[in-house]
Protein backbone atom coordinates (compact mmCIF):
# COMPACT_ATOMS: atom_id res chain seq x y z
CA UNK A 1 0.00 0.00 0.00
CA UNK A 2 0.94 3.65 -0.35
CA UNK A 3 2.98 5.11 2.46
CA UNK A 4 0.94 7.54 4.54
CA UNK A 5 3.42 10.25 5.39
CA UNK A 6 3.33 12.03 8.71
CA UNK A 7 3.16 15.78 8.14
CA UNK A 8 5.85 17.53 10.18
CA UNK A 9 5.84 21.30 10.60
CA UNK A 10 9.00 23.07 11.72
CA UNK A 11 8.48 26.66 12.85
CA UNK A 12 11.20 28.94 11.44
CA UNK A 13 11.86 32.60 12.25
CA UNK A 14 14.48 35.34 12.07
CA UNK A 15 17.57 34.64 14.20
CA UNK A 16 16.75 30.95 14.45
CA UNK A 17 19.72 28.70 15.26
CA UNK A 18 20.54 26.83 12.02
CA UNK A 19 21.19 23.35 13.43
CA UNK A 20 18.09 23.62 15.65
CA UNK A 21 15.87 23.20 12.60
CA UNK A 22 18.25 21.67 10.06
CA UNK A 23 19.13 18.79 12.42
CA UNK A 24 15.56 17.49 12.74
CA UNK A 25 14.88 18.37 9.09
CA UNK A 26 17.80 16.18 8.02
CA UNK A 27 16.89 13.25 10.27
CA UNK A 28 13.22 13.16 9.33
CA UNK A 29 13.77 13.68 5.61
CA UNK A 30 16.41 10.93 5.27
CA UNK A 31 14.44 8.35 7.30
CA UNK A 32 13.48 5.22 5.37
CA UNK A 33 11.23 2.47 6.69
CA UNK A 34 13.32 -0.04 4.70
CA UNK A 35 16.98 0.96 4.49
CA UNK A 36 17.64 -1.58 1.71
CA UNK A 37 15.18 0.28 -0.53
CA UNK A 38 16.57 3.75 0.25
CA UNK A 39 17.06 4.81 -3.37
CA UNK A 40 13.54 3.84 -4.46
CA UNK A 41 11.47 5.03 -1.50
CA UNK A 42 10.61 8.26 0.27
CA UNK A 43 10.67 9.23 3.91
CA UNK A 44 7.59 8.43 6.01
CA UNK A 45 7.84 12.06 7.16
CA UNK A 46 6.87 15.01 4.96
CA UNK A 47 8.71 17.96 6.52
CA UNK A 48 7.45 21.50 5.97
CA UNK A 49 8.83 24.85 7.13
CA UNK A 50 6.34 27.32 8.61
CA UNK A 51 6.93 31.00 9.37
CA UNK A 52 4.83 33.95 10.54
CA UNK A 53 4.74 35.27 6.96
CA UNK A 54 5.67 33.89 3.54
CA UNK A 55 8.79 36.09 3.41
CA UNK A 56 12.21 34.39 3.63
CA UNK A 57 13.66 34.35 7.14
CA UNK A 58 17.30 35.04 8.03
CA UNK A 59 18.98 32.68 10.48
CA UNK A 60 21.78 33.29 12.93
CA UNK A 61 24.78 33.51 10.59
CA UNK A 62 22.62 35.02 7.84
CA UNK A 63 21.34 31.98 5.92
CA UNK A 64 18.17 32.86 4.00
CA UNK A 65 15.39 30.27 4.21
CA UNK A 66 12.09 30.26 2.35
CA UNK A 67 9.11 28.88 4.32
CA UNK A 68 6.59 26.51 2.72
CA UNK A 69 3.67 28.07 4.59
CA UNK A 70 2.75 31.00 6.77
CA UNK A 71 0.60 30.57 9.89
CA UNK A 72 -2.59 31.14 7.92
CA UNK A 73 -1.91 28.65 5.12
CA UNK A 74 -0.37 25.97 7.35
CA UNK A 75 -2.06 22.58 6.80
CA UNK A 76 -3.03 20.13 9.54
CA UNK A 77 0.12 18.77 11.16
CA UNK A 78 0.88 15.45 12.82
CA UNK A 79 4.06 16.74 14.46
CA UNK A 80 5.12 20.29 15.36
CA UNK A 81 8.77 21.15 16.03
CA UNK A 82 9.57 24.50 17.66
CA UNK A 83 13.31 25.23 17.39
CA UNK A 84 15.28 27.83 19.33
CA UNK A 85 17.85 30.54 18.84
CA UNK A 86 18.17 34.23 19.66
CA UNK A 87 14.89 34.92 17.87
CA UNK A 88 12.88 33.14 20.57
CA UNK A 89 13.63 35.91 23.10
CA UNK A 90 11.18 38.18 21.33
CA UNK A 91 8.88 35.56 19.78
CA UNK A 92 8.00 33.84 23.04
CA UNK A 93 5.96 36.93 23.95
CA UNK A 94 4.27 37.50 20.56
CA UNK A 95 0.55 36.77 20.56
CA UNK A 96 0.33 35.37 17.01
CA UNK A 97 3.16 32.92 17.75
CA UNK A 98 1.58 31.76 21.01
CA UNK A 99 -1.83 31.47 19.31
CA UNK A 100 -0.35 29.41 16.45
CA UNK A 101 1.47 27.06 18.82
CA UNK A 102 -1.63 26.63 21.00
CA UNK A 103 -3.80 25.91 17.97
CA UNK A 104 -1.36 23.35 16.57
CA UNK A 105 -0.82 21.75 20.00
CA UNK A 106 -4.49 20.71 19.93
CA UNK A 107 -4.25 18.93 16.57
CA UNK A 108 -0.81 17.29 16.58
CA UNK A 109 0.06 13.79 17.79
CA UNK A 110 3.44 15.03 18.95
CA UNK A 111 4.52 18.48 20.16
CA UNK A 112 8.29 19.00 20.27
CA UNK A 113 10.94 21.65 20.79
CA UNK A 114 14.67 22.04 20.36
CA UNK A 115 16.86 24.23 22.55
CA UNK A 116 15.15 27.48 23.65
CA UNK A 117 12.08 26.64 21.55
CA UNK A 118 10.80 25.18 24.80
CA UNK A 119 10.51 28.72 26.20
CA UNK A 120 7.85 29.45 23.57
CA UNK A 121 5.96 26.32 24.63
CA UNK A 122 6.41 27.22 28.29
CA UNK A 123 5.06 30.74 27.81
CA UNK A 124 2.06 29.27 25.98
CA UNK A 125 1.49 27.29 29.21
CA UNK A 126 1.86 24.03 27.29
CA UNK A 127 4.56 22.74 29.63
CA UNK A 128 2.75 23.31 32.93
CA UNK A 129 3.23 20.15 35.02
CA UNK A 130 5.33 18.64 32.21
CA UNK A 131 8.89 17.40 32.63
CA UNK A 132 10.87 19.54 30.18
CA UNK A 133 14.32 20.77 29.25
CA UNK A 134 16.09 23.44 27.20
CA UNK A 135 19.59 24.69 26.29
CA UNK A 136 21.85 24.39 29.35
CA UNK A 137 22.34 28.16 29.42
CA UNK A 138 18.57 28.66 29.74
CA UNK A 139 17.77 26.04 32.40
CA UNK A 140 17.96 28.55 35.24
CA UNK A 141 15.81 31.03 33.37
CA UNK A 142 13.23 28.32 32.70
CA UNK A 143 13.11 27.46 36.41
CA UNK A 144 12.79 31.09 37.47
CA UNK A 145 10.29 32.26 34.89
CA UNK A 146 8.09 29.17 34.60
CA UNK A 147 7.49 27.82 38.09
CA UNK A 148 4.95 25.22 36.92
CA UNK A 149 7.37 23.49 34.55
CA UNK A 150 9.25 20.45 35.89
CA UNK A 151 12.72 21.38 34.65
CA UNK A 152 14.99 18.42 33.90
CA UNK A 153 18.75 19.03 33.79
CA UNK A 154 20.32 15.62 33.25
CA UNK A 155 18.61 14.32 30.12
CA UNK A 156 19.49 15.16 26.52
CA UNK A 157 15.81 15.21 25.61
CA UNK A 158 12.71 14.67 27.73
CA UNK A 159 9.58 12.81 26.68
CA UNK A 160 6.46 13.42 28.76
CA UNK A 161 3.35 11.97 27.13
CA UNK A 162 3.10 13.48 23.66
CA UNK A 163 5.51 16.32 24.39
CA UNK A 164 9.25 16.06 23.74
CA UNK A 165 11.65 18.89 24.60
CA UNK A 166 15.35 18.69 23.89
CA UNK A 167 18.56 20.26 25.14
CA UNK A 168 20.57 22.74 23.08
CA UNK A 169 21.16 22.88 19.32
CA UNK A 170 22.68 19.49 18.39
CA UNK A 171 20.28 17.72 20.78
CA UNK A 172 17.58 18.21 18.14
CA UNK A 173 19.24 15.48 16.08
CA UNK A 174 18.91 12.93 18.89
CA UNK A 175 15.39 14.12 19.64
CA UNK A 176 14.42 13.64 15.98
CA UNK A 177 15.96 10.15 15.97
CA UNK A 178 13.78 9.44 18.99
CA UNK A 179 10.73 10.59 16.98
CA UNK A 180 11.74 8.04 14.32
CA UNK A 181 12.04 5.38 17.02
CA UNK A 182 8.68 6.32 18.50
CA UNK A 183 6.90 5.86 15.17
CA UNK A 184 8.90 3.14 13.44
CA UNK A 185 11.02 1.42 16.09
CA UNK A 186 14.65 1.30 17.14
CA UNK A 187 15.99 -0.50 14.08
CA UNK A 188 14.72 2.18 11.69
CA UNK A 189 16.09 4.92 13.97
CA UNK A 190 19.50 3.20 14.14
CA UNK A 191 19.60 2.75 10.36
CA UNK A 192 18.80 6.44 9.92
CA UNK A 193 21.62 7.46 12.28
CA UNK A 194 24.00 5.09 10.50
CA UNK A 195 23.07 6.57 7.12
CA UNK A 196 23.97 9.99 8.56
CA UNK A 197 27.20 8.57 10.07
CA UNK A 198 25.90 9.86 13.38
CA UNK A 199 26.36 7.92 16.64
CA UNK A 200 23.03 6.56 17.86
CA UNK A 201 22.47 7.49 21.48
CA UNK A 202 21.77 4.48 23.68
CA UNK A 203 21.54 6.27 27.01
CA UNK A 204 19.53 9.48 27.20
CA UNK A 205 21.74 11.71 29.28
CA UNK A 206 23.21 15.19 28.88
CA UNK A 207 26.33 15.13 26.71
CA UNK A 208 28.06 18.13 28.25
CA UNK A 209 29.07 19.15 31.75
CA UNK A 210 27.92 22.57 32.93
Language model regions located:
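Extended, subdomain-level signal for the structured scaffold at the beginning of enzyme domains
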Residues: 1-111, 120-123, 140-145, 151-154, ...
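A short beta-strand/loop micro-motif in the catalytic core of glycosyltransferases
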Residues: 111-112, 132
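Active-site-proximal catalytic alpha-helix in oxidoreductases
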Residues: 118, 164-177
